Curated annotation (Swiss-Prot):
Catalytic activity, as annotated: L-histidinol phosphate + 2-oxoglutarate = 3-(imidazol-4-yl)-2-oxopropyl phosphate + L-glutamate
Full protein name: Histidinol-phosphate aminotransferase
Cofactor(s) required for function per UniProt: pyridoxal 5'-phosphate
Origin species: Acetobacter pasteurianus
Entries under PROSITE patterns matching the protein: AA_TRANSFER_CLASS_2
GO MF, one example: histidinol-phosphate transaminase activity
EC class: transferase
Subunit structure: Homodimer.
EC number per UniProt: 2.6.1.9
Lineage of the species this protein comes from: Bacteria, Pseudomonadati, Pseudomonadota, Alphaproteobacteria, Acetobacterales
Keyword Amino-acid biosynthesis attached: yes
Protein family per UniProt: Belongs to the class-II pyridoxal-phosphate-dependent aminotransferase family. Histidinol-phosphate aminotransferase subfamily.
Keywords attached to this entry: Amino-acid biosynthesis, Aminotransferase, Histidine biosynthesis, Pyridoxal phosphate, Transferase
Pathway as given in its UniProt record: Amino-acid biosynthesis; L-histidine biosynthesis; L-histidine from 5-phospho-alpha-D-ribose 1-diphosphate: step 7/9
Length: 356
């Protein structure tokens, strides 16, 4: 606390990111990073751009990247916004579209940064409870609000809505922006980008951090009709005209263009997810049906926090989230097949030792 802080800063409860440990000899399954590394073409593009041009400012419009992203789904660059990670894109969207006086609606179990943005921008909000089986009930998002935010697939549950349910959300709130946060969409869920031209109130946010394995580069993006994109640009240019540096722009552009690498990487993660899910179920764990690069799991007879601690003692880090509806669960990133087998073996030992 400080007497120099503004009243707003005193009230803030900042987001707490997943641990980034200094140790290297561990299995890190807590922050949903890719186990396979970025596209070789992206790395080569970054190396090629590491030259004297770094003395110059980057393109403030990131036009080449926006063209590449739009071309992938048949849209022009005027339908695309980019930012310094999807967190920045989300923050700009909250500021641009949700200050209408009425509460913003998002699930009670979801990405915890949403609540932080509401505190930062003094936005009223209402947590809409997930069902008992951790599903989003679309009908609960009717009625007066300043907008709707739904992660699809949801985090930390990994459960995804189908496109028909996304349509229902959009039609329930035709005069408010419906933001679909698709950070994990490439791992088997249906993207809402096909609905962009049909619904002027749809904003779809994605990232390079998960399926494209560029979390360290910090590149996020959004698709929406030009009036929404213009709103985001107005916020960006009132905050930071150059959010993406030169290396980020060329690396991300090359990653977009390497479709073959993306498909191969995603398929490996999805195959490992199946093996991990089945392995956990054989050990007695409940596992939610995931369309993400992680699984959300609990054991009916074991304390989740204690399991996380015991795994850490074995140099395996997973994510345990405190909270009334999350305390019994662990979120486990899908690693390589070897990492998943090591995790399952460790859990098998823990469960056996605890039963003695």
């Amino acid at each position: 606390m400080s007497r120099f802080w503004s009243p707003l800063v005193h009230k803030l409860t900042p987001y707490v990111p997943g641990e980034q440990p200094k140790m290297t000899d561990l299995i890190k399954l807590n922050t949903n990073e890719s186990p396979y590394g970025p596209s070789p073409r992206a790395l080569e593009a970054i190396r090629a751009a590491d030259n004297d041009t770094l003395r110059l400012y980057p393109d403030p419009e990131a036009l080449a990247l926006r063209k590449a992203l739009g071309a992938r789904i048949g849209l022009g660059p005027e339908y695309v916004f980019v930012g310094n990670g999807s967190d920045e894109v989300l923050a700009h969207a909250f500021q641009a579209f949700f200050a209408h006086g009425e509460p913003l609606l998002f699930p009670d179990v979801t990405y915890s940064f949403y609540k932080v943005y509401c505190g930062l921008y003094s936005l009223p909000f209402r947590n809409v409870p997930l069902t008992d089986d951790m599903q989003v009930n679309v009908a609960d998002y009717a009625g007066p609000c300043s907008g709707v935010v739904v992660a699809n697939p949801n985090a930390p549950t990994g459960i995804a809505l189908d496109l028909a349910d996304v349509r229902k959300l959009l039609e329930l709130q035709p005069n408010r922006v419906v933001l679909i946060d698709e950070a994990y969409v490439d791992f088997g869920a249906e993207s809402a980008v096909s609905l962009i031209k049909e619904y002027p109130n749809l904003l779809v946010v994605q990232t390079f951090s998960k399926s494209r394995a560029l979390a360290g580069l910090r590149v996020g993006f959004a698709f929406g009709q030009p009036e929404l994109i213009e709103g985001l640009v107005r916020i960006k240019d009132s905050f930071n005209s150059y959010p993406l540096d030169r290396l980020a722009q060329v690396g991300a552009t090359a990653a977009v263009e390497d479709e073959a690498w993306l498909a191969t990487s995603v398929q490996k993660v999805m195959a490992s997810r199946t093996v991990l899910t089945e392995g956990l179920q054989k050990l007695g764990f409940d596992v939610l049906p995931s369309k993400a690069n992680f699984v959300y799991t609990r054991h009916p007879n074991r304390n989740a926090a204690e399991l996380a601690t015991q795994l850490r003692e074995r140099a395996i880090i997973v994510r345990h989230l405190r909270g009334e509806r999350t305390a019994a669960w662990l979120r486990i990133t899908v690693g390589t097949d070897q990492q998943c087998e090591t995790l399952l073996s460790a859990l098998r030992d823990i469960l056996c030792s605890n039963s003695l």
